Amino acid sequence: MTTNYETMYILRPDLGDEQAEQAITKYQNLLRDQGAEDIQIQNRGKRRLAYEIKKHRDGIYIQLNYTAPATAIAPFERAMRLSEEVIRYLTIKQDIAEEKPPKEEKEKPTKVAATV
């Protein structure tokens, strides 16, 4: 069964444009090899970090939205953890609500006043 996921990761700011593109392609191919589909990549650009991470004040933010089996996440995150180009990552399982018809309220029986 496949699930929708969103992964946001931050690359080191000292990577050049070509190196950043190679890293993005590397992780995209890794996901595809693990069975991911519908991979959407958004390069959010270089931004200031809220606090220093591994002696870096800036980072290149990349967002991935994809559909993958649950077994694809562990190898993907392991590759990021071992990589020196990624300084932080987070994967979130997205709950996409299916449209359900509204529940019909049961009609309450009306009480009829008895006249005596």
UniProtKB/Swiss-Prot annotation:
Gene designation per UniProt: rpsF
Q: Which NCBIfam families match?
A: S6
Q: Which PANTHER family match?
A: MITOCHONDRIAL 28S RIBOSOMAL PROTEIN S6, SMALL RIBOSOMAL SUBUNIT PROTEIN BS6M
Source domain of life is Bacteria
Return the protein name: Small ribosomal subunit protein bS6
Query: What InterPro entries has UniProt attached to this entry?
Result: Ribosomal_bS6, Ribosomal_bS6_CS, Ribosomal_bS6_sf, Ribosomal_S6_plastid/chlpt, Transl_elong_EF1B/ribsomal_bS6
Q: Which GO terms describe its cellular component?
A: cytoplasm; ribonucleoprotein complex; ribosome
> Per the record, which residues fall in region Disordered?
97-116
CDD domains linked to this entry: bS6_chloro_cyano
Q: What does this protein do?
A: Binds together with bS18 to 16S ribosomal RNA.
Q: Which family does it belong to?
A: Belongs to the bacterial ribosomal protein bS6 family.
